[in-house]
């Protein structure tokens, strides 16, 4: 029998960011974005830095994620992120100030990583 929903849990070390039934996900994988629909094949993958999109009906919820893992099995999706943030938890003005400070740094891999993380949080907060 085919299911029409996914049971999703998004967990960071700090808290449970989301738990519930959803229609679909768009996930920032370490090698690019991918979609998850009900009855997806079993999957384990690593997460990159980006916006996790959770769709339930006409509603879209965005969560900033910074690395971690996803497991999909039997319409249950477990997402464990190294760090995640909900829109309501992000101080957009503080993130914009942090972005200005990061942009002053000399070019490096760590600067690029900080830029990506900060821009992702700003994107989630502004949606």
From Swiss-Prot:
<comment type="function">
    <text>Produces ATP from ADP in the presence of a proton gradient across the membrane.</text>
</comment>
<keyword id="KW-0066">ATP synthesis</keyword>
<dbReference type="InterPro" id="IPR001469">
    <property type="entry name" value="ATP_synth_F1_dsu/esu"/>
</dbReference>
<dbReference type="GO" id="GO:0046933">
    <property type="term" value="F:proton-transporting ATP synthase activity, rotational mechanism"/>
</dbReference>
<dbReference type="GO" id="GO:0005886">
    <property type="term" value="C:plasma membrane"/>
</dbReference>
<keyword id="KW-0406">Ion transport</keyword>
<keyword id="KW-0375">Hydrogen ion transport</keyword>
<keyword id="KW-0139">CF(1)</keyword>
<comment type="subunit">
    <text>F-type ATPases have 2 components, CF(1) - the catalytic core - and CF(0) - the membrane proton channel. CF(1) has five subunits: alpha(3), beta(3), gamma(1), delta(1), epsilon(1). CF(0) has three main subunits: a, b and c.</text>
</comment>
<comment type="similarity">
    <text>Belongs to the ATPase epsilon chain family.</text>
</comment>
<keyword id="KW-0813">Transport</keyword>
<keyword id="KW-0997">Cell inner membrane</keyword>
<keyword id="KW-0472">Membrane</keyword>
<dbReference type="GO" id="GO:0005524">
    <property type="term" value="F:ATP binding"/>
</dbReference>
<dbReference type="InterPro" id="IPR020546">
    <property type="entry name" value="ATP_synth_F1_dsu/esu_N"/>
</dbReference>
<keyword id="KW-1003">Cell membrane</keyword>
<dbReference type="InterPro" id="IPR036771">
    <property type="entry name" value="ATPsynth_dsu/esu_N"/>
</dbReference>
<protein>
    <recommendedName>
        <fullName>ATP synthase epsilon chain</fullName>
    </recommendedName>
</protein>
<dbReference type="Pfam" id="PF02823">
    <property type="entry name" value="ATP-synt_DE_N"/>
</dbReference>
<dbReference type="GO" id="GO:0045259">
    <property type="term" value="C:proton-transporting ATP synthase complex"/>
</dbReference>
